[in-house]
């Protein structure tokens, strides 16, 4: 889970700020959903985006079911790598610090990486560069299905 990842990295790298958005979340009474306040979204998710676009994006955020962040994926050697994966690394991400992003990439081998010098929302902060790099990478993927054993 994401919480476990944070605990692991925090124990290995004391003093590294891994707070992200966590401290600014607002919770429903049953703690099943978290809500990102607009000011927090602007400061942590959208800090490098056009101000008007950032405000529009922040206004569209909705409560998030915490079950999604608690998921633990079980990878198998037989299935891992059958579907090409692209990780978009956001080097200035204030929500998921780069050290956590890189650890996630280590845990899911064989992913291709696009590294952008932007915050948490590259599709809004650098849409042209993201599209260019995605198109280039996708053009290199095979369109045929791999043989099954």
Where are these regions (language model features)?
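Flexible "cap/lid" loop of the alpha/beta hydrolase fold
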Residues: 1-38, 68-69, 73-74
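Short, amphipathic alpha-helical "lid/cap" segments that border enzyme active or binding sites
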Residues: 127-135
């Amino acid at each position: 889970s994401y919480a476990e990842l944070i605990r692991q990295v925090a124990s290995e790298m004391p003093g590294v700020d891994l707070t992200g958005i966590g401290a600014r979340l607002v919770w429903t009474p049953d703690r099943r959903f978290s809500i990102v306040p607009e000011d927090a979204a602007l400061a942590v998710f959208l800090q490098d985006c056009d101000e008007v676009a950032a405000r529009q994006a922040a206004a569209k955020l909705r409560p998030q079911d915490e079950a999604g962040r608690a998921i633990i994926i079980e990878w198998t050697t037989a299935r891992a790598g059958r579907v090409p994966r692209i990780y978009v690394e956001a080097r200035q991400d204030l929500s998921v610090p780069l050290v956590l992003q890189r650890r996630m990439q280590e845990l899911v081998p064989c992913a291709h990486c696009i590294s952008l010098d932007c915050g948490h929302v590259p599709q809004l902060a650098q849409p042209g560069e993201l599209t260019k790099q995605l198109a280039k990478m996708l053009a290199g993927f095979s369109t045929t299905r791999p043989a099954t054993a």
